[in-house]
């Protein structure tokens, strides 16, 4: 791997920036290309599991957890640490059902992280600034391992040692290198809303339920309505909500199952959603924000729930084309359960580590070593995430039965 051609990373999300930061910290040249502008918004929060943030902090030089939470926690501006209580609430009665593993000595500490803040924090964890070039939407990938060429829609061309595909579930790189791998649509309905409210209103309406927790996880009879803090200041709280359930029947007669909506149409609030929310008989605080009048003042999106699975042979074939995959480009999974961001971090850490460890050897072998670790880990997670969707959208009778067995 004597060549000083840079590694070309397509996508400035969590996986791409993690890869770039660790390669840069190891002295390996790389450039990150991002289709959107620097001010793109993706300010919702994600759950970082203990195994995910532990390996990240270790890879960045054994940083303390407080360094991470001070930089990324949704409530960092008021001294919070992104803590969540993991409690499950009945959204029809506003009563707490249970706390998973409440009395377990091995209960996992989950940290909530604002996505924008996490990207900035990762990018800043090193002495040398990352080379991130915005406004570069990929058009073409050509060549082979050791000498790849990429062309962008703005007319720019670059040569590199290899390409890292960090460009998400609808990966342009994957569509060209592994065209037969298509995202699978999970038969689920998911609407996501964002809103802001004064801090005093948050303290009055949510604090009695959440305390210091950054999530209020509400479940109903086969549907979910979690609230989450995205960002909190002394005066205002930016929050989001989700409304999700399995598709009814085959989906053909389900007015809310619309997996192939155009992006502009996905931002419109359908009458069927308003009617369905009204039929749910929600308790406060859910009823105050999930109603036809309130959501007209929110930014509401219809999200298609998709996942991506690949074979080990697919990945090896891509190596010959000079491409390695990280993040959702090769293991997109439903958001329920909070694993996707953690595997994106792990990918970046493991790929950068394999490349650095094999810096004096064969690059193809180094990438193969990465997949020896990452393929089973990530593909097992895709399978788990699909199963978890149905577990998290069970009938209320099952939730109440569970609550009898688990402590508050």
From Swiss-Prot:
Protein name: FAD-dependent monooxygenase nscC
GO BP annotations, alphabetical order: secondary metabolite biosynthetic process
Similarity comment: Belongs to the paxM FAD-dependent monooxygenase family.
EC number(s) on file: 1.-.-.-
Source species of the chain: Aspergillus fumigatus (strain ATCC MYA-4609 / CBS 101355 / FGSC A1100 / Af293) (Neosartorya fumigata)
Residue ranges that the Swiss-Prot or TrEMBL entry lists as coiled coil: none
Carbohydrate-modified residues: 91, 103, 170, 231
Cofactor: FAD
One of the record's GO molecular function terms: FAD binding
Binding site for FAD: 34, 45, 119, 328, 341
Keywords (A to Z) from UniProt: FAD, Flavoprotein, Glycoprotein, Monooxygenase, Oxidoreductase, Signal
